[in-house]
Amino acid sequence: MGYMCDFCGEQRSMVYCRSDAACLCLSCDRNVHSANALSKRHSRTLVCERCNAQPASVRCSDERVSLCQNCDWSGHDGKNSTTTSHHKRQTINCYSGCPSSAELSSIWSFCMDLNISSAEESACEQGMGLMTIDEDGTGEKSGVQKINVEQPETSSAAQGMDHSSVPENSSMAKELGVCEDDFNGNLISDEVDLALENYEELFGSAFNSSRYLFEHGGIGSLFEKDEAHEGSMQQPALSNNASADSFMTCRTEPIICYSSKPAHSNISFSGITGESNAGDFQDCGASSMKQLSREPQPWCHPTAQDIIASSHATTRNNAVMRYKEKKKARKFDKRVRYVSRKERADVRRRVKGRFVKSGEAYDYDPMSPTRSY
């Protein structure tokens, strides 16, 4: 078992971020680096599986491990590495942004067994790794018989969320603690780390839904309005073939909190606990985010400090302009500041250039036509 994620501290770290100098699991990597445009530019790669503290640069195909430069040199080029020096190694490329599962597969095509065949993978990871969403929109589980929980159909498409595609009597369901009563109540998506090919499905749509969601019109049915309200609310309905990413698309943080039960639940995504019903579900646009937060945004109204700082800047700019205008009007000619002192100094007697008092000897008298020595 490797080191824990530096962000959540619950899942095994798999990705190393060079800018943050942090080891993250796939879940936290998606949540942290999708916050803004600056974080999407961070360069990330796999974490070294030997030291768990440095970014991996090569992948050893024989040992099936990712190694940093130091661990690669000590394991393959060291003094006691005669047998391992001929191992086949491949360079690991870095990535940035929030790539999809297909893009991650192309980047790390040589190490797709990283989580699937790992003996250190938890039972929860194994169970969620088997749950996928196919193109038809039905929840399939490979290798496990699909059993549908029989419940009366309702008019709300979101109520199909309570039906799980995991068999009630299967060993996987027992390990996961999943049943028809506590699937939405006890499963927290943040605490589940998954394989690379399942990275997009869970965090593109919060968690997998059963066939009941898609039988009632697909994902687009959650956002469609009644025909009676189309005249007042001009909102185009989403396509039934919408991808899982469109389920979560918003201009701010990807936060979705909903539940099909009337009681309060603790379904969590990105660390936010949802306490809403299916009827209250809304698209995570900029307007709905303000309704969910119900907090005054600091950038809407200027504070008193901003006003004071702006006034100080205006005063300073005006003073600089006045200084420049006075500097242009300066005159550098010689002027006498005290004319009366100048007139008296021109007629006083001196000795060696200094003024003398009345009655004392002097060597220069400006009033005398001839100089006395």
UniProtKB/Swiss-Prot annotation:
Q: Where in the cell is it found?
A: Nucleus
Family of this protein: Belongs to the CONSTANS family.
What GO molecular function annotations does the UniProt record carry, in alphabetical order?
DNA-binding transcription factor activity; zinc ion binding
The yes or no answer to whether the keyword Cytoplasm is present is no
Gene Ontology cellular-component annotations = nucleus
UniProt KW keywords: Metal-binding, Nucleus, Repeat, Zinc, Zinc-finger
Which residues bind Zn(2+) 1 per the record?
5, 8, 28, 33
Name the lineage: Eukaryota, Viridiplantae, Streptophyta, Embryophyta, Tracheophyta
- Protein's name in the database: Zinc finger protein CONSTANS-LIKE 10
- What domain of life does the native source organism fall in? Eukaryota
Q: Where does Zn(2+) 2 bind?
A: 48, 51, 71, 76
PANTHER family annotated for this entry? ZINC FINGER PROTEIN CONSTANS-LIKE 10
Zinc fingers classed as B box-type: ranges: 5-47, 48-92
Tell me the ranges covered by the CCT domain, including all copies: 316-358
Name the Pfam families on file.
ANCHR-like_BBOX, CCT
Report the source organism: Arabidopsis thaliana (Mouse-ear cress)
